[in-house]
Curated annotation (Swiss-Prot):
A Pfam family hit: SRA1
Low complexity bias: start-end ranges: 834-845, 924-939, 950-968, 1004-1014, 1062-1079, 1129-1138
Summary of the function given for this chain in its UniProt record: Component of the coat protein complex II (COPII) which promotes the formation of transport vesicles from the endoplasmic reticulum (ER). The coat has two main functions, the physical deformation of the endoplasmic reticulum membrane into vesicles and the selection of cargo molecules.
Any single GO BP term: endoplasmic reticulum organization
Location of region: Disordered: 822-845, 868-1154
Residue ranges, compositional bias (Pro residues): 977-1003, 1045-1061, 1105-1123
Species the sequence originates in: Aspergillus niger (strain ATCC MYA-4892 / CBS 513.88 / FGSC A1513)
Identification of the protein by name: Protein transport protein sec31
A Gene Ontology cellular-component term: COPII vesicle coat
Ranges of the WD repeats in the UniProt entry: 5-47, 66-109, 118-158, 164-204, 208-251, 255-295, 298-338, 382-407
GO MF term list: structural molecule activity
Subcellular location per the Swiss-Prot or TrEMBL entry: Cytoplasmic vesicle, COPII-coated vesicle membrane; Endoplasmic reticulum membrane
Amino acid sequence: MVRLREIPRTATFAWSPGAASPLIATGTRAGAVDVDFSNQTCLELWDLALSRHETGGELQPVAKIDTDSGFNDLAWTESEDNSRGVIAGALENGSLDLWDADKLLNGSDDAVISRTSKHSGAVKALQFNPKHSNLLATGGAKGELYISDLDNIANPYRLGGTAARADDIECLDWNKKVAHILVTGSSAGFVTVWDVKTKKESLTLNNMGRKAVSAVAWDPEKPTKLVTATPLESDPLICVWDLRNSHAPERTLRGHESGVLSLSWCAQDPDLLLSSGKDNRTMCWNPQTGHAYGEFPVVTNWTFQTRWNPHNPNFFATASFDGKISIQTIQNTSTETAQAIADQNQALDGEDFFAKAQTQPQVSSFSLPKPPKWLERPCSATFGFGGRVVSVNLVEKGQRASKIKITPFEVDEAVGKSTETFETALKEGDLRSICESRAANAGSDEEKADWKVIEALISKDPRKGLVEYLGFADQADEAADSLSKLGLDKEEEVNGEVAKESRGSGAKKHRRLQSMFDANPEADSFLSDLAASKGAKTNNPFHIFNGSENEADTGITRALLLGDFEKALDVALKEDRLSDAFMIAICGGPKCIEKAQEHYFQKQTNSPNYVRLLASIVGKNLWDVVYNADLSNWKEVMAALCTFADEKDFADLCEALGDRLEEELRNNEDKGMRKDASFCFLAGSKLEKVVAIWIEELREHEQKAIETAADDSAFSIHVRALQGLIEKVTIFRQVTKFEDTERTKESDWKLSTLYDKYIEYADVVATHGRLQVAQKYLDLVPEKHPEAEIARNRIKLATRQATPQRTQPAAATVTRAALNKPLPQPNAFQPQRAYSPATPAAVPSPYAPAAAAANAYAPPTTATNPYAPSTASAPAQPVNPYAPPAGGSSYTPAGYQPPKAPAYGAQPLGGGVPPPPRASNQSPAPTVTTYTTATNLPAWNDLPEGFAKAPTPRRSTPAAATVASPFPNQSPTLTQGPPPPAGQRAPSVPPPPKGTAPPPRMTSPPAAQPASTTMPPPPANPYASLPQSPPMASTMGVPASIPRGPSPYNAPPTMPPPPNRYAPSPAAQAASPQLQTRAPVPPPPQAAASPYAPQPPAAGHYVPSTPPPHVQPPPQQAPPPQAAPGSRPSTASSQKKPAPAPPKYPPGDRSHIPADAMPVYEILSADMQRVKSRAPSSFKAQVDDAERRLNILFDHLNNEDLLKPNTIADMAELARAIQARDYETARTIHVDIMTNRLDECGNWMVGVKRLISMSRATP
């Protein structure tokens, strides 16, 4: 029930036909006087722009044309010749005018189609036939009723006699089922049914004493039913008639307090009827049962016309004599956010003089007991997350009861089976059989090669497996056989024993690529063998020096004799005696061997290729082989890597070789190299590289399969390919024990393409009901991945087990040992629903303070107490003489939200005043179930959040008496407040004073107050009895019980104390909790002399609709609120408040504003001057007040106090947003500062907020 748009006109109106964006045609109402006393009459067209969530300023007409007279009625119909149709106007001067809507919208001068004046007096009503859009019925003064054909508009024919009648035809309506039946209602009370085909009167209803008829409407589905309305203020009735009994109405609808002026029966749902009248109200009825659903917001003058939108019945419009046509919706919006903002603003504006001059329009809301017919569905089905289909069917045809069925559903059953098979195989752990199976069923050579390589990696010696896969095992055996024929690998006996091999495991002598120094194992023990033959005597004597040696021989011999093997090596190398040099190097150790090898390789410039390979192997520089070997020998390079590469370099060497193959692939597009590169990446465990190749292969194979498939769908093909990819990656990760080191990163992942496939696969398997499998793969994706986070949350919600609900007894009590003599606790609570319906108003709470500014437990906007009265449209509360007057502190933390209610059964700190008992003749309040309550729970008729803007405050809107229940013939729901919040025990409030003098008023707390100790919070169970705690000592006695009957908290009948002009209203107080915990205030000294003096507030006054907050920090963290300027001096304490520190510079001085704050001053002051120069004179007070508050801000900036640097920076950004007319950004910054930095806000914050609003409204 939200007002979406307003047209500022006192006019009759008509909706545009068709499904296009709705337009409204308005014609100046005859006899009405506008605010300017203008006598101009015109026809205007308005574009409602309902597709836009918000509109700035008033609506402006899109077309306008002046007329000769005012309008009594308007009608708009479709036309074959005009896309936008034809508009007909019933004018006060008796003219019937027709306009072309297309030409009006185009601004054409010849928009008038025709102008006829067959009526001798004013035309009162007109309507197009719903079946034949060219037929137009018009009724007017002296009983004249004409039927016009648009094809021959100049020659209408008249129904009924030509004799003049004294009564006027005030209304008419075509039958919605029978095209030639028409009904009219006259001022003399005649309701006549006409047969246009025979041009005769069919029957006249006995209209209950011939009371005047102001409106008539046919049932949209039943051709014999209609409703009529009477405009009499003494007896406003809506009568439902069935033509089969024309002597008496079938039923009467009573609810209006004054005459009914308009009716509109919904064409899409015959159970919905709108009525409006002289009581300023628009009501919604069920004419089939006579039940009144509720009423819409009351306006300030008669509502003379209401109409459903003919195409979209979610909308309707109502015209009233207060100068507005309101376009509303029957749907509810979530108003809690808007209410919170309104309460917050009201709290901020609590001291403002003009804030109290305006009142909020009455907010009415009700819920239909069943959805409208156009929203009903006899059956429906939807796909649910997790492989489920939810279907709804009627239990029995014709009944409203439905049954819900949830069934599993799989798009492709093969997907589910393959997923289960793979997961089962993984649990068994037989990876080799998986690889063998997938390789055997591979669809391409590349896929088969991948599985074979992964299988090779499973072996205990992966490198040996890779070499064997490359086919080098057979070649090595062949080379060994060839060498055996040469007799180079015979095992020789040394000292009668076979020499043992010096190589490692599996290495044979003289195998391919073995070192030339390992060919003869006896070389390692050459010298030792010579030494072992110490005692042997041979027949081959020799001379160390025989005189024929050259200088080189002598040098080598001398060096050997002295053990200087390095010098001997140098001489041998210099003489190029490589054989001798290598033998000497063997004796000299590793250093000499390395030197001899280096010299040897330097000399071999034109040597065979194996020499360079040998150099790389000996020098442990396999990078030379990887980067420089021809790619046609990549297998040989890979075999060398598997044989000689260090473990730490092996992966990088394989990756480098694979990169070379990929680069060559891009150059010559040889698809075979992609498989070779994949092998290298697999061997090096480079998942990020091989995944890119696999995904590319997936796309190609998928496209090829789609082109050749006969029966498979594209989805099934894609899912099977995706399944294969996931299986390969999963097995590869397990085989190589891959660890993803980037899961903690927030972006720039190397495996981002794989993560996308994981998310896609998780979505597929989740769609097939495998939520656990989906969760498993989503856990492999980084936590900060946005899409994975959404998917994980969906699965978490889908797999969440429902919490078992404990049944609450109807009335639960908690038995505890009494700590002291308890106050009497009558069981005043009655079980009700956990959510009270959004009633327009409730009985004022007899123990809620009228305006407790020092209340530390002011409630948030969301009520969680089932006994809390709704605050949707509560009237102003009477001034409570027992409530302390409100302090006018600028410290109003409106953004503060108390924590949640404590757990059940917690011990309270103390009671307050118990709820008053019900009178003995009262019965428990009936439970009313509504579809929409003041909660965050959505209902069927909720609009999207933010669709409609909150109602704008208007001046002088009466707070009309509201209905306590949206359903008639039911007793109003009495609501009870929750138990008092936590706090120390305060004495009970005595009866009202009998004297004439007002009680002393307390305007500020004592300067020093003790901090409250931390105690358990009170129970959240609304049905539990209130536990007791010992009362505090008091100068007054505690009454034995609370008397029944009128509440002792009501104001005394004589001479109530004057209300504090600056005290915020209860709604404002509810949104302005104090951040400090207040201790009980001791009674004033004068209290001893007056036993009826009011008690000071206890710690945390009780306010309805508030969950008990936890204990707050001690009062040193926030200063106590200051007294209002106009409040009386405190009588509660002789202590004085500390005087505020004087400013460094006088007010108005702007010469000391720092540079970073200067944009705030310059932009805001300039925009304030712009608003001030263009604002209407009637808003001068508001503009001046906003300027005054901005000057407070500028003073703070000039003194460099209150505002911190980050707040000044945000204010500068806010100012620049205002300068750029980006008011949404400015408002967002304003709310952020007000919410998160409340200690820096003050009166100046209201000025900034008002400047944003005024600047937005100022052109």
